[in-house]
Amino acid sequence: MKITVGVPAYNEEKNIAGIIQNLTEISDTVIVCDDGSTDNTAKIAEKMGAIVITHERNLGYGGAIRSLFLKARELESDMLVTLDSDGQHRISDVLPVVEPILKNQADLVIGSRFLTENQEDMPKYRKIGIKMITSLANSSIEDTVSDSQSGFRAYGKNILSEITPSENGMGVSNEILMKVSKKGFKIAEVPIIVSYEGDTSTQNPISHGASVTLSTLKFISIDHPLKFYGLPGLVFLAIGLVFTVMTIQGFTETRQILLGTAVIGVGTIIFGTVLLMTSIILYSIVNLIREKN
């Protein structure tokens, strides 16, 4: 079986050599996607013998993952393992991550940071954010997971051939997860240990979390338009009808129009109708596209 390891990298000249050196001991093919780095990441990776994909500008984590998928497909790899380039993942965890695919027990394996108790050093804000985003992802997939944001994953050949990520940002992890679930592929998790020593993430956790959340909601709205738009639409319609009845009753009793109540009633009815129409139109479009495909 041809196992390829892919590493998305952005300005990781300090870590990339050691990571590649350790990976070449367990894999014949290591791909590094240099995502518009301004340092010597690409040169060092080439010198260490990795296949290097170079982005002229920084596309984002999702853009790098997409390039790794396409390159692994081009190389006719049987499996793609992805891990981060910041040195936080243990190379020794690669074998446990690929094992379920080797045993035909899964098509996607996620290295989860929450299946082991040795994660006390994970920043609390990160732990809370990851769990919230994971809960959101779990609301739209069949096999629930504990760590939807882990970059340490293994993808089987079926996934490589049938799924191409489209997100450029960090939302790609949930995008892939939802697409994998929708196609009926099997998802498994194994415990991994991550070191947060010297964690130098420059991303604002709030903007990062908001970006991933919005991306996830976008895919949920496309996959489940009736639930996402239709149910809130019905709720707003019901609220609008209640306020409309209150307006009519008030006018009957006092011969005066309760302006505030009337505005709320009309506004919520209009908004609810728009949501319902959106759900029906989007549902029809999505089904039409699926039938053509």
Predicted regions mapped to residue ranges:
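Acceptor/aglycone-binding surface of glycosyltransferases and processive sugar-polymer synthases
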Residues: 51-74, 79, 91-170, 174, ...
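Acidic helix N-cap motif at the loop->helix transition within catalytic regions
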Residues: 14-18, 39-48
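A conserved acidic beta->alpha catalytic loop
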Residues: 34-42, 87
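Short, well-formed alpha-helical segments that are part of the catalytic scaffolds
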Residues: 7-25
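Hydrophobic helical membrane-anchoring modules
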Residues: 168-293
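Conserved sequence signature across two-component system core domains
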Residues: 9, 33-35, 55
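Cell-envelope/extracellular polymer assembly enzymes that use nucleotide-activated donors
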Residues: 2-4
